[in-house]
């Protein structure tokens, strides 16, 4: 599938990581690539090995014209809901770019609030280089944060499942309860909190 690109110089790509996990921030990245510094091997971050993602993230940071991260905390996710929090995090990423883009490609089927023209592209992380780069930066940043959280709370196994709802994560929630980084509005976490209060 060929994506029609607008005839402007500054195009940003935006993607998110972390809508599904029960813990931690939803993390987004916005990237404007430098056409004079091509990056080989850009692809959907989910299709790359961790080692390849880490290497590409460094290369993107070195070669991109500019990049920025946007995030929403578990508290914001609980207040807004995950969809609205994701949109807000995307807006924050674009607003954080040191050079503002003339056009923005967003991964997915919804557009966040932006001051410039934008287009949402389903599976954009496989179709648009700027979105691929953003997906890699966001994934590496969030995964690294989960590794750090794992050091503080090793009993939950965050370094392995990255906060996603796995059997191991459910078991740890049942055994140890929720930590402050857990998203209290997500049903599995609500269930554990209710049990702890003796309501379930």
From Swiss-Prot:
InterPro entries, alphabetized: RNase_HII, RNase_HII/HIII, RNase_HII/HIII_dom, RNaseH-like_sf, RNaseH_sf
Cofactor: Mn(2+); Mg(2+)
Top-rank lineage group of the source organism: Bacteria
EC number: 3.1.26.4
GO BP, sorted A to Z: DNA replication, removal of RNA primer; mismatch repair
CDD domains per UniProt: RNase_HII_bacteria_HII_like
Cofactor note: Manganese or magnesium. Binds 1 divalent metal ion per monomer in the absence of substrate. May bind a second metal ion after substrate binding.
Primary localization class, coarse: cytoplasm
Gene Ontology cellular-component terms listed: cytoplasm; ribonuclease H2 complex
An MF annotation (GO) of this entry: manganese ion binding
Protein's cellular compartments: Cytoplasm
Domain RNase H type-2 as annotated: residue spans: 9-198
Chain residues that bind a divalent metal cation: 15-16, 107
Entry keywords, A to Z: Cytoplasm, Endonuclease, Hydrolase, Manganese, Metal-binding, Nuclease
Chemical reaction(s) catalysed: Endonucleolytic cleavage to 5'-phosphomonoester
HAMAP family, sorted: RNase_HII_B
Function, as annotated: Endonuclease that specifically degrades the RNA of RNA-DNA hybrids.
Protein family (similarity comment): Belongs to the RNase HII family.
NCBIfam families: PRK00015.1-1, PRK00015.1-3, PRK00015.1-4
Name of protein: Ribonuclease HII
Taxonomic placement: Bacteria, Pseudomonadati, Pseudomonadota, Gammaproteobacteria, Alteromonadales
């Amino acid at each position: 599938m060929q994506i029609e690109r607008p005839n402007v110089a500054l195009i940003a790509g935006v993607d998110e990581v972390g809508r599904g996990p029960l813990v931690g921030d939803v993390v987004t990245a916005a990237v404007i690539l430098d056409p004079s510094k091509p990056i080989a091997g850009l692809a959907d971050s989910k299709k790359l090995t961790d080692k390849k993602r880490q290497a590409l993230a460094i290369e993107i940071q070195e070669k991109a014209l500019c990049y920025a991260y946007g995030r929403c905390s578990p508290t914001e996710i609980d207040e807004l809901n995950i969809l609205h929090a994701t949109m807000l995090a995307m807006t924050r990423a674009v607003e954080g770019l040191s050079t503002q883009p003339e056009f923005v490609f967003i991964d997915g089927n919804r557009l966040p609030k932006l001051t410039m023209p934008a287009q949402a592209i389903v599976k954009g992380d496989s179709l648009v280089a700027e979105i691929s780069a953003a997906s890699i930066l966001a994934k590496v940043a969030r995964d690294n944060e989960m590794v750090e959280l794992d050091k503080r709370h090793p009993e939950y196994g965050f370094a392995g499942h990255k906060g996603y709802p796995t059997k191991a994560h459910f078991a740890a929630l049942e055994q140890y309860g929720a930590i402050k980084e857990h998203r209290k509005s997500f049903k599995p976490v609500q269930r554990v909190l209710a049990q702890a209060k003796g309501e379930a």
